[in-house]
């Protein structure tokens, strides 16, 4: 079964094509992405109206490239990110997916963007066993119990304020690194001393929920430190900030896996591309006897391939198509895999 999927939740226009085989395995056939990040950079963040217009302009050419790369003209299924995300951006992708599905006479599946991030990993590491999922991106930070990609996901905890990726962008802006800040801040942090400046670790006290995150206080602590120490090395500030984020994320994720008796930790989402997070996760998983799975960096960021993979797993588990009047949902919770 050939599944074509559209991703348009934020500032990447993605079209992915995957093959769901009879044995349940999923093979990637095409993964084409067009980004409007440069158009947003001068504003210091994503501008929803610009993102929506960029999707309108990029979707047709991106679709053509994906079909050509896969060597097909018509899939068996069309899927799309139906939420969560920016309202206007979602509308563009969902409307296009419905139109393609109707024109080709094939079923439409509106699926969860966050589930897609988890499902991207199967392209690199094969079928996903029961896992604890640490989902970290610009707008989301969740700890999840993933029994399988075809079953409802259980949320163990999330952030009470800023997402990890949001904190990265805000600190990068504070240090004058521009937008998007995650990759540039990561590169700067590698040249600094992560022990030179110790920033607070939010929600790690004895009375705090072990699976809940908070990064707003960390962001404020960095801002106050830079204001009080204008001569401080920005590389050391970046390294200290990054160490705080990676420390909290990995400690809570490893604890969740240990508490649940689950032997696999999956880290997914845009922040999963961060070098220190990956490094510290490897160290802590090895010490705890856990198997760590992290997609290649290209599959950590938004793309259509991940949506095709998640749709494939839902279909394999018996999910029925979404109606063509299914509405996009900017606030779709992570526990709801599909709008049916």
Swiss-Prot record:
One of its GO terms (biological process) is tRNA threonylcarbamoyladenosine modification. PROSITE patterns: GLYCOPROTEASE. Required for the formation of a threonylcarbamoyl group on adenosine at position 37 (t(6)A37) in tRNAs that read codons beginning with adenine. Is involved in the transfer of the threonylcarbamoyl moiety of threonylcarbamoyl-AMP (TC-AMP) to the N6 group of A37, together with TsaE and TsaB. TsaD likely plays a direct catalytic role in this reaction. Binds 1 Fe(2+) ion per subunit. The gene is tsaD. It comes from Mycolicibacterium smegmatis (strain ATCC 700084 / mc(2)155) (Mycobacterium smegmatis). It holds the Pfam family TsaD. It comes from the Bacteria. Fe cation binds at residues 113, 117, 302. Substrate binds at residues 135-139, 169, 182, 186, 274. This is tRNA N6-adenosine threonylcarbamoyltransferase.
């Amino acid at each position: 079964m050939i599944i074509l999927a559209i991703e348009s939740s934020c500032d990447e226009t993605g079209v992915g094509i995957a093959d769901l085989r009879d044995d349940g395995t999923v093979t990637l056939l095409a993964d084409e992405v067009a980004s409007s990040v440069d158009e947003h950079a001068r504003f210091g963040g994503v501008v929803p109206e610009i993102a929506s217009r960029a999707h309108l302009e990029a979707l047709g050419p991106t679709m053509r490239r994906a079909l050509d790369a896969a060597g097909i003209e018509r899939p068996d299924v069309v899927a799309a990110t139906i939420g969560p995300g920016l309202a206007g951006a979602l509308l563009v992708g969902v409307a296009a997916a419905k139109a393609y599905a109707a024109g080709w006479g094939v079923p439409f599946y509106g699926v969860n963007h966050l589930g897609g991030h988890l499902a991207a990993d199967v392209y690199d590491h094969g079928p996903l066993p029961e896992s604890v999922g640490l989902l970290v991106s610009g707008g989301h930070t969740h700890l999840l119990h993933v029994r399988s990609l075809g079953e409802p996901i259980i949320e163990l905890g999330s952030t009470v304020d800023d997402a990890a990726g949001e904190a990265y962008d805000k600190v990068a802006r504070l240090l004058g690194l521009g937008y998007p800040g995650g990759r540039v801040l990561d590169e700067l942090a590698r040249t600094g001393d992560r022990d030179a400046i110790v920033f607070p670790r939010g929600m790690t006290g004895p009375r705090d929920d072990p699976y809940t995150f908070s990064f707003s206080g960390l962001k404020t602590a960095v801002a106050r430190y830079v204001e009080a120490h204008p001569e401080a090395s920005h590389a050391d500030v970046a390294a200290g900030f990054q160490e705080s984020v990676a420390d909290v994320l990995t400690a809570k994720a490893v604890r969740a896996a240990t508490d649940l008796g689950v032997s696999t930790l999956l880290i997914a989402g845009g922040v999963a591309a961060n070098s220190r997070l990956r490094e510290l996760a490897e160290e802590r998983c090895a010490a705890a006897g856990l198997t760590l799975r992290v997609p290649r960096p290209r599959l950590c960021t938004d793309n259509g391939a991940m949506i095709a993979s998640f749709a494939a797993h839902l279909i394999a588990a018996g999910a029925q198509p979404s109606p063509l009047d299914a509405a996009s949902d900017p606030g779709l919770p992570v526990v709801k895999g599909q709008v049916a």
